[in-house]
């Protein structure tokens, strides 16, 4: 059923773009949006990446999904720029797409031909693919940053960051799960983490903030960017066609 849904969505151009806000704290002002993919099932339900990503990876379909999502996102960015909205969009690039040489070549070529996108798009990559220290990955990241695009580290599994190395690769953001940050330890440990990142010009965004109590604990740690259901659940993007 899942494979049929993926293939049907790709054939019908039906991969949907959802947005979740990233806010400043304590103001809760929307300053960024995380872009998320959803694949519709026949009964009106939606598949989230956790349900389809492994199968899509095995079948070599992830780049096609990323391609459709990027197309939707570009439409959205252009509409936001026409309306002079000062907002940024985080766009996740999957590990499989990073390894798809043909797709990534076309992807970089498209971005080079559309330089205005660099002001609004921030590309996210998993900590695992960055930690692999693969030469081809570093070259691909460099190609993006040479075009002026900002980068973000996502799907973080450990907090042993090399701030200098990430800054050298032009990472400007790191997203960390709120539960992981709570487990990390005390106020001083988090302050040291934030200090290490801020010295290298990297902003920390805490995601999966789900309650006011959780937020209160995080505010005591000096967190300035947040994301999670407390500030807004993912909602379908309303995209206007290019005029």
Q: What positions do the PLM features span?
A:
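Flexible, glycine/charge-rich interdomain/linker segments that couple
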Residues: 1, 86-93, 235-238
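Active-site core of bacterial EAL-family cyclic-dinucleotide phosphodiesterase domains
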Residues: 1-55, 232-235
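Catalytic-site/binding-pocket detector for metal-dependent nucleotidyl cyclases
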Residues: 14, 60-61
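EAL-family c-di-GMP phosphodiesterase catalytic domain
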Residues: 25, 39, 95-97, 122-132, ...
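Short acidic-capped amphipathic helix/loop micro-motif used as an active-site/signal-coupling element
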Residues: 41-46, 70-74, 155, 228
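Catalytic core of bacterial c-di-GMP phosphodiesterases, primarily the EAL and HD-GYP domains
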Residues: 61-136, 208
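Alpha-helical scaffolding segments of alpha/beta enzyme cores, especially the outer helices
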Residues: 75, 105-109, 136-146, 188-196, ...
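Helix C-cap/helix->beta junction micro-motif
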Residues: 83, 114, 147, 199-200
């Amino acid at each position: 059923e899942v494979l049929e849904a993926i293939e049907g969505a790709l054939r019908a151009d039906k991969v949907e773009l959802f947005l979740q806000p990233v806010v400043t704290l304590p103001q809760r002002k929307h300053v960024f949006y995380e872009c998320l993919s959803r694949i519709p099932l026949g009964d009106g339900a939606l598949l989230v990446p956790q349900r389809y990503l492994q199968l899509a990876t095995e079948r070599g379909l992830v780049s096609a999904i990323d391609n459709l999502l990027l197309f939707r996102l570009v439409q959205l960015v252009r509409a936001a720029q026409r309306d002079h909205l000062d907002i940024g969009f985080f766009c996740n690039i999957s590990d499989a797409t990073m390894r798809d040489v043909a797709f990534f070549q076309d992807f970089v070529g498209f971005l080079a031909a559309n330089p205005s996108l660099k002001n609004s798009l921030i590309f996210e990559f998993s900590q695992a693919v960055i930690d692999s220290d693969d030469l081809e990955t570093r070259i691909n990241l460099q190609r993006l940053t040479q075009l002026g695009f900002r980068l973000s580290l996502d799907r973080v599994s450990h907090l042993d960051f090399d701030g200098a190395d990430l800054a050298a690769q032009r990472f400007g953001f790191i997203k960390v799960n709120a539960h992981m940050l709570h487990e990390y330890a005390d106020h001083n440990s988090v302050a040291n983490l934030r200090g290490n990142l801020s010295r290298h010009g990297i902003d920390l965004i805490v995601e999966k903030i789900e309650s006011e109590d959780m937020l209160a604990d995080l505010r005591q740690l000096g967190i300035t960017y947040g994301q999670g259901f407390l500030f807004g659940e993912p909602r379908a993007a309303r995209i206007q066609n290019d005029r």
